[in-house]
Amino acid sequence: MSALVPPVLLASSSPSRGRLLSEAGVPFTAAAPGVDEQAIKASLKAEGVSARDAAIHLGEWKARRLSLAHPQALVIGGDQIAAIDDLWLDKPGSLATARQHLLLLRGRTHVLETAVVVLRDGQRLWHHLARPKMTMRSFSDAFLEDYLDRAGAGITACAGAYQIEGLGLQLFAAIEGDLFSIQGLPLLPLLDFLRPHGVLLS
């Protein structure tokens, strides 16, 4: 890569976001963002910030520390919040909470507020918000218990308690939105942003 092309850093511990960038051929280095995500979310909720704005703020905060530590780098931050009505659904953290979330979402449509933000030298250069609409089918209690048993602890770190690229697909009757955004990264708009910076060929 030319010395004139800025390095790309992904401020995320998410395997899904890293996998999407790798599969798209984006040269990048991943690093943990080093922020207290739950404390930031609690503060934003207390301030009455909407889920869509919170996703953008969280993506930016995740990228900021790395951006200040790596001058000239393009630092990508992202966040995803499942929202239904005015309620945010945080990552469940346990299978018991995952069950509660899925019972709430069953037979209803929720939105995945999915933000990606790019910073350089601590300043936001660009952001994009995707809002996939996810309609869960009215699955049976037996299906729910089988799903929780088979999906296991991995879903406790996922917004909405599912991974669409796996068993979670069986939860849904309909989706509106691209699969990249549903998996946590609005990839096509991000690639469009990176091209003029020389990271990818136009």
Curated annotation (Swiss-Prot):
Q: Which GO terms describe its cellular component?
A: cytoplasm
What is the required cofactor set for this protein? a divalent metal cation
Which one of the record's GO molecular function terms can you name? nucleoside triphosphate diphosphatase activity
What's a BP term from Gene Ontology annotated to this protein? nucleotide metabolic process
Alphabetized SUPFAM superfamilies for the sequence: ITPase-like (SSF52972)
Q: Which residues form the active site?
A: D79
Q: Does the keyword Phosphoprotein apply?
A: no
Write the Enzyme Commission number(s) for this entry.
3.6.1.9
Q: Locate the transmembrane regions by residue number.
A: none
- Return the InterPro entries for the record: ITPase-like_fam, Maf-like
Q: Catalyzes what?
A: a ribonucleoside 5'-triphosphate + H2O = a ribonucleoside 5'-phosphate + diphosphate + H(+); a 2'-deoxyribonucleoside 5'-triphosphate + H2O = a 2'-deoxyribonucleoside 5'-phosphate + diphosphate + H(+)
Tell me where it resides. Cytoplasm
Keywords of the record: Cytoplasm, Hydrolase, Nucleotide metabolism
For the keyword Cytoplasm, the answer is yes
PANTHER family tied to this protein: BIFUNCTIONAL DTTP/UTP PYROPHOSPHATASE/METHYLTRANSFERASE PROTEIN-RELATED (PTHR43213), BIFUNCTIONAL DTTP_UTP PYROPHOSPHATASE_METHYLTRANSFERASE PROTEIN-RELATED (PTHR43213:SF5)
Purpose of the protein: Nucleoside triphosphate pyrophosphatase. May have a dual role in cell division arrest and in preventing the incorporation of modified nucleotides into cellular nucleic acids.
Q: Which family does it belong to?
A: Belongs to the Maf family.
State what protein this is by name: Nucleoside triphosphate pyrophosphatase
Source organism (scientific name)? Rhodospirillum rubrum (strain ATCC 11170 / ATH 1.1.1 / DSM 467 / LMG 4362 / NCIMB 8255 / S1)
